[in-house]
């Protein structure tokens, strides 16, 4: 906006982003490319209101983001909610690789038992390097912020951060399969 000669304080921009980012994320979900069937699932930590909260994330074997969810607790219920949401969006995976997290293990076994399916569970920290490295893109943006004040604003801003990260990775389904830059993909969502 400053390039066009319009000077705006940072607080209205922050308020606009809190309103617009959830809508942008919803529009992106409708146009997201399908992901692979071998997922890597992990959680990372984000500081909200001086306390650590848990950002569940999953990527496929190629490094494409499957889904993300910010929760207050790293328990079985939160991991299962994340997993069911990812399955509803992308279908059942064949394999899920996790670290030694007990909550993730319990959630996957619970989904296997309830849905009468057999998702192969692998616990290998070296295969999980893809998702660990993918956390860096989110941390690169959130660490300079020095944490969030409120949980609801953290959820909304992380939706925007993750959406922009997935757009940069090229996961938006483009019309006519034409090659588009990240800025062109963003404009196609926004307008």
Spans of features found by a protein language model:
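Residue-level recognition of single "structural anchor" positions
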Residues: 1-191
């Amino acid at each position: 906006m400053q390039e066009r000669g319009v000077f705006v304080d940072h607080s209205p921009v922050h308020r606009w982003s809190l309103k617009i980012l959830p809508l942008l994320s919803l529009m992106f979900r409708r146009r997201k490319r399908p992901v692979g069937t071998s997922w890597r699932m992990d959680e990372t930590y984000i500081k909200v209101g001086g306390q650590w909260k848990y950002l569940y994330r999953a990527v496929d074997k190629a490094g494409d983001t499957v889904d993300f969810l910010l929760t207050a607790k790293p328990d079985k219920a939160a991991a299962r909610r994340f997993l069911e949401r990812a399955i509803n969006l992308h279908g059942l995976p064949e394999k899920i690789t996790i670290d030694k997290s007990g909550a993730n293990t319990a959630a996957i076994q619970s989904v296997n038992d309830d849905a009468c399916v057999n998702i192969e569970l692998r616990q290998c920290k070296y295969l999980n390097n893809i998702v660990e490295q993918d956390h860096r893109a989110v941390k690169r943006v959130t660490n300079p912020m020095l944490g969030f004040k409120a949980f609801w604003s953290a959820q909304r801003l992380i939706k925007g951060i993750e959406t922009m990260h997935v757009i940069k990775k090229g996961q938006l389904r483009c019309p006519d399969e034409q090659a588009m830059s990240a800025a062109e993909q963003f404009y196609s969502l926004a307008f």
